[in-house]
């Protein structure tokens, strides 16, 4: 049997496939749903691979093609061809077939396919025996055709109603102009031929035909008769084209491969365009396909379909690595798919997104599970590592390649952590003999400070680098970015307060960073101090003091009275010497981390950096996060200029293009261009990650519900601060505020430095509130804000800003109302009035009855009428506004008259419910 020709359309519809198999469309739709295909209805078109899968599934259940299928197949495709005989030895019998007429095709719907094929084969064989074919020399040369006697070059006129030489005797002629609207020779009296080849003359009887098949040749592309029909054996090759046809041409009278040597007729071969004496169009003409087109066609045929689109599938274990903030286009490039198809698949999964929109990891996980891929979103550290490897920078390889001769001892880096107001900064002031606390607003540390202190330990002057953090936010951010800058953590606990929630949180962060801890029990000079209680409480968190048999050093100190400071420094150095290998290579380009950064009006971007390895010098090209530039000047914590900084040395660096974030790593590059390119790529990656983070996932149901209920309220903010660490801590704290799903918080812009006109312009466009943290607007920005009515708020304490924003968010919530009973009256009498209707004579049993109040009528404890209004309220023929308990009055309920003696009238009012 030939190939399956039941599907004639490129994308058949569901009802066509169902009709072909003789099943109901609902059964086909149910089967498609079981197969995981998303199809709306019977008129939906499906891809050919899906149609094949559907047909195979239905046939496997016993739904074989019946009457409906026969009819569809007969109307949609030509008659099936008989099997070809073997032609290897050249002795096989010919395969003559007579073309089917219109009547035959109509009758085919009523007969069985096997009976049709047998009848046609017998009729064709008899006709072939009666009329031997002409052109014996050419036919003899063809292996698939037996030798034929030459003598008659054309069949008897009138023998074949579909032959191109019908009624023309032995002389073939061109098709009549206008007979076939699809013919290439329409309106012309001659057959088409190439311009450089003369038009062939009609063949003489007994002479070889011009259009005879080539020896051993097969079918030309696009040649042959009508689909499913073969030329009559021995008919003259009167059709235009023939052997002189260009490759890929579709002239009438082409040949159908190794089947017969006939050539007359206007039809085309399988896949041809023009066909039939009555102008019935055949299939689309096929040109010669390139290898790429054939490969794409094969891949499309083999690819599975989902949601009406064709997408490649994985085996469930194929890993796809994506960067943060990747889009559907990036995922499509990884799996070699069409982004539009993935958008459709994601839509059917309940997620709406564009092809270029940055998506979060959860969305890619859903899409990957559906398609059989394991999606892995690289972490920020791995992403930055891969980015640097693109510039031939491998920090891990540098550390592994260092030998012991290159390493030198460096000072330990110590981070002071603890609960708010437990004396962290006061302790550092005592160590440095300074007074930083007085400079902080409210006595709360809101900046990160880095200092280096020299102390004498066992007769040797040694340096210790201290980092003072504002609570735990900055330390969390550093740990999240892999900036392990801390060697030792000092946990400050007040002896009078003991363990507090933030103490536990700081302890957890220090243990997660895997750094040794030294506990400083502060405020031991207070009368209510209880250091033993602190030691006992910390044993629950695996911090056992040495005097209790543990390995953690506890030191009792008093920062105010300068008690135990030297003992604390000795404990830090002993802990560092006992369990840490504090060495670094100073003889290479500097590597480190930005501790803090700010925008100075005279000096520009100033970053406090801590060198971890190498030596930083003035003039080096440096990149820190998304900021880059050359080191123009360096200074220590006291403001003294520094020409070079060794490992574990904190310095202030000037010359960066922008303000880096707290915790950003910095490296020294050979050229400014390299630093700029790294910064630009980091900025692009960070922007995509922020877009994916800010994107709110919404399902189709949520989207419909939002449309019905109205838009979601949003509070837009612009944050400007003096240092990047404070801005970041404020942003993280604000994003943690949870009020209600109907109100959202959007931070449009955050930055370091004074409030500028551009900030006011952005706030004007998006109706945003500008928050200035320890910064003020310039004169022009202040005037612009007053003119545009932009709300600009200034804060110096971070907690005040958080409280105000939370109050603003609660104020944006839609008020919640609760129903409160205001009064109850019993009906004692009903007065009927033709003008006012029924009037209830009542006595107020409790509360107050107010005119125009909402009311309901209760009869035997059942509400029989609700949402009424007290339209009239009278007492002794006087209109009154309210009637109190134990007083009588008359109540008119407007058009509602179904009241009886003994009913109750209850008045209610809606009061706004205060939010907790």
From Swiss-Prot:
Where do the segments described as G5 lie? 558-560
Region G2: start-end pairs: 443-447
Positions with biased composition (Pro residues): 195-206
Alphabetically list the UniProt keywords: Cytoplasm, GTP-binding, Initiation factor, Nucleotide-binding, Protein biosynthesis
Compartments reported by the entry: Cytoplasm
Disulphide-bridged cysteine pairs = none
Q: Output the Gene Ontology cellular-component terms.
A: cytosol
> In which residue ranges is the amino acid composition biased (Gly residues)?
214-227, 235-282
State where composition is biased (Basic residues).
283-294
Domain tr-type G per the UniProt entry, residue ranges? 409-583
What ranges does the record give for the region G3, renumbered to this chain? 468-471
Pfam name, any one: IF2_N
Annotated stretches, region: Disordered: 58-317
Question: Region G1: what ranges?
Answer: 418-425
Q: Where is the composition biased (Low complexity)?
A: 120-142
Q: Where is this region: G4?
A: 522-525
Name of the protein described by the UniProt record: Translation initiation factor IF-2
């Amino acid at each position: 049997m030939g190939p399956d020709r039941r599907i004639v359309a490129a994308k058949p519809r569901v009802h066509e496939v169902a009709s072909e198999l003789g099943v109901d469309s609902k059964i086909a739709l149910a089967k498609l749903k079981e197969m995981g295909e998303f199809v709306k209805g019977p008129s939906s078109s499906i891809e050919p691979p899906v149609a094949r899968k559907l047909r195979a599934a239905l046939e496997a259940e016993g739904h074989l093609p019946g009457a409906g299928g026969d009819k569809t197949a007969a109307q949609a495709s030509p008659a099936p061809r008989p099997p070809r005989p073997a032609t290897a030895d050249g002795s096989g019998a010919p395969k003559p077939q007579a073309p089917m007429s219109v009547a035959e095709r109509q009758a085919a719907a009523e007969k069985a396919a096997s009976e049709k094929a047998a009848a046609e084969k017998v009729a064709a064989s008899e006709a072939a025996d009666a009329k031997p074919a002409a052109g014996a020399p050419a036919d003899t040369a063809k292996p698939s055709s037996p030798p034929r006697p030459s003598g008659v070059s054309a069949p008897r006129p009138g023998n074949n109603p579909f032959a191109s030489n019908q009624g023309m005797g032995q002389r073939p002629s061109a098709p009549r102009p206008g007979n076939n609207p699809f013919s290439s020779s329409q309106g012309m009296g001659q057959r088409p031929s190439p311009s450089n080849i003369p038009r062939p003359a009609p063949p003489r009887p007994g002479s070889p035909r011009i259009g005879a098949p080539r020896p051993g040749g097969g079918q030309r592309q696009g040649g042959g008769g009508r689909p499913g029909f073969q030329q009559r054996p021995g008919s003259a090759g009167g059709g235009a084209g023939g052997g002189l046809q260009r490759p890929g041409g579709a002239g009438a009278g082409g040949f159908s491969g190794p089947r017969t040597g006939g050539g007359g007729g206007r039809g085309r071969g399988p896949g041809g365009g023009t066909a039939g004496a009555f102008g019935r169009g055949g299939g689309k003409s096929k040109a010669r396909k390139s290898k790429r087109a054939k490969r794409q066609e094969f891949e499309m045929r083999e690819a599975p379909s989902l949601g009406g689109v064709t997408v490649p599938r994985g085996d469930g274990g194929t890993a796809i690595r994506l960067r943060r903030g990747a889009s559907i286009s990036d995922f499509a490039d990884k799996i070699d798919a069409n982004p539009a198809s993935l958008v459709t698949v994601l839509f059917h999964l309940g997620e709406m997104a564009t092809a270029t929109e940055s998506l979060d990891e959860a969305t890619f996980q859903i899409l990957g599970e559906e398609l059989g891929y394991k999606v892995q979103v690289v972490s920020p550290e791995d992403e930055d590592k891969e980015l640097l490897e693109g510039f031939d920078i491998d920090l891990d390889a540098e550390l592994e390649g260092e030998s012991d001769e290159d390493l030198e001892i460096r000072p330990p880096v110590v981070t002071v952590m603890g609960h708010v107001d437990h004396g962290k900064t006061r302790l550092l002031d005592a160590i440095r003999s300074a007074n930083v606390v007085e400079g902080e607003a409210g006595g709360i540390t809101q900046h990160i400070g880095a200092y280096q202190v020299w102390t004498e330990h066992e007769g040797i002057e040694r340096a210790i680098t201290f980092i003072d953090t504002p609570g735990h936010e900055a330390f969390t951010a550093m740990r999240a970015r892999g900036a392990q800058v801390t060697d030792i953590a000092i946990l400050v606990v007040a002896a009078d307060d003991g363990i507090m929630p933030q103490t536990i949180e700081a302890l957890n962060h220090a243990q997660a960073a895997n750094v040794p801890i030294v506990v400083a029990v502060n405020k031991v000079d207070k009368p209510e101090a209880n250091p033993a209680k602190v030691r006992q409480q910390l044993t629950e968190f695996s911090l056992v003091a040495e005097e209790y048999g543990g390995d953690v050093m506890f030191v009792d100190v008093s920062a105010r009275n300068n008690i135990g400071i030297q003992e604390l420094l000795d404990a830090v150095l002993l802990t560092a010497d006992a369990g840490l290998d504090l060495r670094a290579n100073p003889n290479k380009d500097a590597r480190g981390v930005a501790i803090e950064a700010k925008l100075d009006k005279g000096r520009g971007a100033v970053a406090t950096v801590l060198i971890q390895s190498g030596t930083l010098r003035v003039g080096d090209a440096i990149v820190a996060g998304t900021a880059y530039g050359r080191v123009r000047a360096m200074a220590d914590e006291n403001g003294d200029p520094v020409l070079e900084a060794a490992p574990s040395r904190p310095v202030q660096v000037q010359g960066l293009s922008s303000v880096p974030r707290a915790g950003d790593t910095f490296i020294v590059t050979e050229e400014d261009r390299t630093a700029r390119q790294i910064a630009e790529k980091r900025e692009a990656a960070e922007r995509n990650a922020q877009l994916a983070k800010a994107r709110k996932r919404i399902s189709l149901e949520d989207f419909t519900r939002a449309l019905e209920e109205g838009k979601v309220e949003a509070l837009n903010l612009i944050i400007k601060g003096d240092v990047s660490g404070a801005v970041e801590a404020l942003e993280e704290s604000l994003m943690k505020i949870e009020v209600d799903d109907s109100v959202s918080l959007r931070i449009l812009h955050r930055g370091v430095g004074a409030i500028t006109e551009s900030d006011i312009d952005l706030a004007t466009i998006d109706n945003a509130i500008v928050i200035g943290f320890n910064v003020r607007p310039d004169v022009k920005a202040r005037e612009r804000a007053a003119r545009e009515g932009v709300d600009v708020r200034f804060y110096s304490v971070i907690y005040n800003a958080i409280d105000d924003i939370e109050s603003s968010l609660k104020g944006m919530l839609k008020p919640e109302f609760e129903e409160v009973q205001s009064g109850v009256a019993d009906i004692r009498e009903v007065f009927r009035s033709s003008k006012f209707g029924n009037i209830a004579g009542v006595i107020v049993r409790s509360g107050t009855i107010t005119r125009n109040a909402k009311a309901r009528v209760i009869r035997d404890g059942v509400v029989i009428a609700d949402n009424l209004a007290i339209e009239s309220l009278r007492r002794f023929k006087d209109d009154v506004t309210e009637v109190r308990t134990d007083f009588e009055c008359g109540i008119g309920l407007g058009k509602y008259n179904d009241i009886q003696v003994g009913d109750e009238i209850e008045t209610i009012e809606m009061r706004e419910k205060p939010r907790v």
